[in-house]
Amino acid sequence: NLRTRLWQRGIRLASDMVPNHTGMDSSWVVNRPDLFVQRRDCPSPSYTFNGENLSPDPRVGVYLEDHYYSKSDCSVVFKRVDNQTGDTRYIYHVNDGTGMPWNDTAQIDFLNPEAREAVMQDILHVARNFPIIRFDAAMVLAKKSIRRLWYPQPGHGGDIYSRSEYALSDQEFEAKIPNEFWREVVDRVAKEVPDTLLLAEAFWMMEGYFVRTLGMHRVYNSAFMNMLKKEENQKYRDSVKNTIKFDPQILKRYVNFMNNPDEDTAVAQFGKDDKYFGVCTLMVTMAGLPMFGHGQIEGFTEKYGMEFTKAYRNESPDQNLINRHWHDIFPLMKKRYVFANVENFLFYDVWDNGGVNENIFAYSNSAGNEYSVVFYNNKYDRAQGWIKQSCEYAVKVGEGEEQHVEMRSKSISEGLNLHAEDNKFVIFREHHSGLWFIRRSKEICERGMYIGLNGFEYQVYMD
């Protein structure tokens, strides 16, 4: 009853699922070999399979290509032999086209409707046991990825050795997989296990596609980590502006993170000083789902491989780092209800001497009678300027066939519900320093709000 006990404490139990492949020694490889991408002949005369039989079942032999053992080549297939009939198949390893094959895996063939339904049933089974499912490497099952990797267009070499032999025309490809698999997953889960939250790990700049077109509930937002780490601030600000121009609700579906098990640790990427805490402040105060990596708060530097059963470095938690989280970050997390929604979210350009300073992130939000304004300078340079009018965002107007989208913008004074009257003042507290400020409401209404920030400085105004 672990799931029930967690739910009583406000925690949802999540499962990680790999829908794209199985292990090369899985029960499906033994009992349902037709579900995999395969061929009857060996794709290369240099491949040999004389090593140990890796199958757990005596009915079937499974052989890794010999050059993996000598680390002198990396075959795209392994060999499966039916020991009763002699039937021999060469099943492809998983391969995302960016590196070597994953040589302990077997790639499921998603052009096979039987394979798609088998994976679908497994997903539904997991959903009945876990209220959250995280899909590993979900982007490789988008149709354009299946096309690029496994069934290229005629005349194209393809990204994986020997797959050009299995080229399909557009018409043939669409006939075999008319719908996006993930769209079908979202619809089936909504119908059969409706309280399940689906979370996709999707890279290759496909995050927007997964939420806009495929309807995925949450999607990893790798741009947050990568662009802020590299201080590609204009790029990330543009991505936020483009998102709210299309549909601000999409911001809520992004999972923002500073590291994950496949990446370097947060300490390695962002350090332990102001830049780390500035980006972490963005992570917990923007709409979307903030995700902390294992050991991030403690400042651990070891990157754990998936085969690790324990940590190999004897690391001690950095108490100073933990204390700063308690002071700067955790109180903001208790106010997530102020930051989590987008109905009142406004994103601002910071203007200085007639130009926009792209290094400063500035936005406001509110919930009920609680208001917030967040500033962060993601550059080791002094920066200052004014915010007054928000960037444009989309609003759906009307209903049914009459519904259309309008672009709107609000001022900072509207965002904070201020009035331009001489006898009105606004009092607010800066969270990091604990200092209180008082400003004339009329000044903010007429001129906007001024901000001056040192390199990597962040300020959060609340109360």
Identify what each model region corresponds to.
Residues 1-11, 23-332, 341, 357, ...:
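Alpha-amylase-like alpha-glycosidases and glucanotransferases acting on alpha-linked glucans and related
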Residues 13, 17:
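Single, function-defining residue in the core of a domain
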Residues 18-22:
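Substrate-binding cleft and catalytic face of glycoside hydrolase catalytic domains
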Residues 236-242, 342-368, 430-446:
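Flexible, glycine/threonine-enriched loop-and-boundary segments that flank and lead into catalytic domains
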Residues 300, 390-395, 423, 431-432:
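Active/binding-pocket-proximal capping segment
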Residues 352-415, 462:
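Carbohydrate-binding surface patches
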Residues 402-446:
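Trp/Gly-enriched beta-strand surface patches
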Residues 444-463:
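C-terminal beta-strand-rich structural cap/linker in extracellular carbohydrate-active enzymes
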